């Protein structure tokens, strides 16, 4: 589960780089939404992993 938390976090960072830096001007809105979605998924996966004790 921790693996998935790290994967979601990396995807969130990549989406943030594209969305907040203006590299992909046409996809700014989508990148910002993806950043939030994957950041929430990363946090949720990390918390579930901690609660399971693995």
From Swiss-Prot:
Keywords: Cell membrane, Membrane, Transmembrane, Transmembrane helix. It comes from the Bacteria. Its main location: membrane. It is found in: Cell membrane. Pfam families: DUF1328. InterPro entries: DUF1328 (IPR009760). The keyword Transmembrane helix applies. The chain crosses the membrane at residues 5-25, 28-48. It is a multi-pass membrane protein. GO terms for cellular component: plasma membrane. Belongs to the UPF0391 family. This is UPF0391 membrane protein Tbd_2238. It comes from Thiobacillus denitrificans (strain ATCC 25259 / T1).
């Amino acid at each position: 589960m921790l693996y998935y938390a790290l994967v979601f976090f990396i995807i969130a960072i990549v989406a943030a780089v594209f969305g907040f830096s203006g590299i992909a001007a046409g996809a700014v809105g989508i990148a910002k939404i993806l950043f939030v979605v994957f950041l929430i998924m990363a946090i949720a996966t990390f918390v579930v992993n901690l609660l399971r004790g693995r």
